[in-house]
């Protein structure tokens, strides 16, 4: 059953849907989550080839090896979808989301430390890049998919998804230029350290969503 209550209206107005959704703490946390995870996703997709090139890989090798991020990300989306369908207690999909994102934080700190070396270990960096894809894209895929229906239901799914994706695209637009500019001034090691903070905030937002789902289930 959906969390949003639109009253007895069969086709609630857009303003009714918006007010109802914004009044839900879980939905507000989901907006923060969407903004940050789309920002992180965009940094990886736009800038991973440049990052690998800057730390010493050849141009063609950097482009090819950067594919490990979305490739393992596919596995992450399949895993979290299967797991939450079969094992999420009381419909709390956010629990697995914050658990996966907490591992993402560790992966990004590891990339930051490894890329600061004068002789980077490329195999380890690629391992953590792939792991980042798995642990980021899985939770990311939940924001405008399953969680939309869990929160807004069929009546409000379109508006709910539009707002969530809109917030995400703002984060993606910022990432498209900010990460490259930061790397020029601070270096990639510092960029990934900053991104790990964003990942930590994403983890916290998913944790608060999980707490919200648990409280509703117990009510």
Predicted regions located by residue number:
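Juxtamembrane intracellular "pre-TM" segments in multi-pass secondary transporters
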Residues: 1-30
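Extracytoplasmic gate region of multi-pass secondary transporters
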Residues: 24-81, 140-145, 174-176
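Helix-to-loop junctions at the C-terminal end of transmembrane segments
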Residues: 77-91, 183-184
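Cytoplasmic membrane-interface "Motif A"-like loop-to-helix N-cap segments
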Residues: 86-102
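C-terminal ends and interior cores of transmembrane alpha-helices
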Residues: 102-118
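A membrane-interface helix-boundary motif in multi-pass transporters
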Residues: 180-199
